[in-house]
């Protein structure tokens, strides 16, 4: 079974003036810590909501030129037995590179394995049907398609 795991990270950012700047720096900082080892981890801004009214808040909390930014880190974990196993693997892999940054698993979604195979089969059958529908063309048309535009003038002469 393959799973898509979304982990929330609370990234501290220092000496910032605005929430937008804090988010940009947090994404950059997290990307530097994860790459090149985990370049398959997707980094997104986190969604925060007010616990009382449900209003959407910015992903960065800013106070005294310091910020705490909520980021969502998404990765796919392959060949796992259970959802909990996928969550542990994702937390371990990401947590090893993001030292002293708290992580919380937000979502675990099982990825259906059959959809990849059927998509490939459908696309290959669609290509073969398109090839069958094309009428046979002249040999001269094939030759002109193979020639680069820079050399067409030389052939015409």
UniProtKB/Swiss-Prot annotation:
Task: Note the Pfam families from the entry.
Answer: DUF555 (PF04475)
Q: Per the database entry, which stretches of residues form a coiled coil?
A: none
Put simply, this protein is called UPF0212 protein rrnAC1165
Family assignment?
Belongs to the UPF0212 family.
Name the residue ranges with Acidic residues bias: 106-157
Disulfide bridge map: none
Q: Which domain of life is it from?
A: Archaea
Renumbered to this chain, region (Disordered) spans 105-157
């Amino acid at each position: 079974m393959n799973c898509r795991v979304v982990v929330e990270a609370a990234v501290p950012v220092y000496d910032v003036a605005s929430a937008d700047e804090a988010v940009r720096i947090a994404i950059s900082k997290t990307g530097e810590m994860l790459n090149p080892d985990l370049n398959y981890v997707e980094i997104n801004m986190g969604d925060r909501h007010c616990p009382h009214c449900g209003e959407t808040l910015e992903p960065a909390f800013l106070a005294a030129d310091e910020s705490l930014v909520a980021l969502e880190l998404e990765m796919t974990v392959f060949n796992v037995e259970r959802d909990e196993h996928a969550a542990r693997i994702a937390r371990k892999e990401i947590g090893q590179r993001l030292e002293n940054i708290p992580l919380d698993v937000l979502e675990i979604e099982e990825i259906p394995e059959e959809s990849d195979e059927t998509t490939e089969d459908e696309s290959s059958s669609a290509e073969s049907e398109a090839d069958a529908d094309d009428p046979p063309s002249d040999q001269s048309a094939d030759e002109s398609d193979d020639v680069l535009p820079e050399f067409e003038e030389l052939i015409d002469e």
